[in-house]
Amino acid sequence: MKKILVGSNAFFKDFKGFKSKDKDYLVFIDNPEDFKIRKEICLRGIDMFYYKRLSPIEMINYTLETNDPLLIGKFLVPEVAEELKLSVTDILALEPMLSKLDEQHQYQVIIFNHIKNNNSFILTEEQLDEAYQFYLSTRKDKEK
């Protein structure tokens, strides 16, 4: 069972001073017995997201049907894209949902736009730093 690190840790774990309240992992299950499409288990700062392995189109369509913008982030992680054999074109259908992200997840809009412009899930250090600086700005305001 392969665990893929997702969420802010997937992008910013190597940045000096980065701290996250939790770690999110994504696991794909070929034939789940105790859930239909997804299941989430949170325990002591570790959030496990289990998904039935679907085709890229089915995964995108499921995300669109749920209308939950927080599901977008997993598609931006290069390891997830590789595991699902996603193309940049595949994720473009999710673009209208970006406007529904809350402020603390708006860094994903920056990442999405860079992926789109690069036509690649691999970002430059400068692009990741831009997203990280935005990420930090949304957290600092909440601490005051």
Kindly give the residue locations of the regions a language model identified.
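Active-site nucleotide-donor binding segment shared across nucleotidyl transfer reactions
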Residues: 1-23, 27-31
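Short acidic-hydrophobic surface loop/beta-edge motif
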Residues: 39-43
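Catalytic cores of NTP-dependent nucleotidyl/adenyl transfer enzymes across multiple folds
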Residues: 45-144
